[in-house]
């Protein structure tokens, strides 16, 4: 709270576990601080929408820490597509997994700490794939395979827009 009240601080960097992002971000915004937040910026769209409203009212800035847009491979793919080497992109498929040793007490497997594949690595996959769609999807289908704790061990996502562009994503941890 002292940090939020400090007039010498203009921006807050939030690198706490996912489940606390919303409260910290909202508190910072209500104290007129800009916020740079690690992914996932919030655990659902309702939390983000509320923060965006505060941002608009107070003329602040929020940003998330999805770094893939700055990586050399992403820049190369973007260039290849922009030069039309591949023709029109109609489908993007992303398979993204990482291995986390199963530990019921680890935040990655804890539903109270916003664990699971979607909130941990899904942000990267969805951001990457959505970047190449001309418009937002009209159809969103998802499925998941849970760990015993209830968080998603694996998730499948299908997105489709009016231009008939399709995104297929598979995540696992």
Which positions does each model-derived feature cover?
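Beta-loop-alpha module in the N-terminal Rossmann-like domain of NAD(P)-dependent dehydrogenases
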Residues: 1-52
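Alpha-helical elements of Rossmann-like donor-binding domains used by nucleotide-donor carbohydrate transfer enzymes
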Residues: 2, 11, 23, 50, ...
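Short, Asp-centered acidic motifs that coordinate Mg2+ and/or phosphate
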Residues: 10-11, 91, 166
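Short catalytic-loop micro-motif centered on adjacent basic/acidic residues
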Residues: 14, 35-38, 62-65, 141, ...
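A short helix->loop->beta-strand "cap" motif at the edges of active sites that frequently abuts
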Residues: 31-33, 57-61, 163-165
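A contiguous active-site-proximal alpha/beta segment in oxidoreductase catalytic domains
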Residues: 42-102
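Mid-domain beta-loop-alpha active-site segment that forms a flexible
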Residues: 65-72, 103-136
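Contiguous beta-strand/loop segments that form the cofactor/metal-binding neighborhood of enzyme cores
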Residues: 127-173
